[in-house]
Amino acid sequence: MMIGFIAIVVVVVMWYVGTMNKLRAAALKVDEADSGIDVALTKRYDVLTKQLAVVKEYASHESKTLYETIRLRQGMSMKEKSDVAEKMNEVASQLHITMESYPELKASDNFMALQSSITDVEEHLQAARRLYNANVTSYNTKIVMFPASIVANVLGMTKRELFEAEEYKKQDVEMKF
């Protein structure tokens, strides 16, 4: 009887440790994907800043301030990162409108290279968002499914938020000047 009890305890402990390790691995994947979004946003900011410099070289005047400096910091919530991404979308839209006013700018090799870079950066950012959301969904599913939810509760694991656009950001943008 004692051997049976010890065997049950060993099985339960092994299950607990295995489940704990799986949940922690899922949390690490979410953190890694979160870092991927930070990298993509930083790269996007750098490319937009370079494009703005090229536009300013060709423009004889500035009608508006086209961007505000956005500092990406560790520990931003997904909502804050989403807001930063939206501000960068506005900057990109304004840059494209400004570019239309200067046809010679569109022919610039530097500008064309930057346009290509922006496309690459946008694709990378979208991929980072998809990876993050996939990892968050997997993690959130694991921590609420019984019996793993018991271990998740003991470890204090909580649901993570998805990176998603707010309703008004899903609609077409109307530019007014």
Where are these regions (language model features)?
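A helix-centric hydrophobic-segment signal that preferentially recognizes long
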Residues: M1-F177
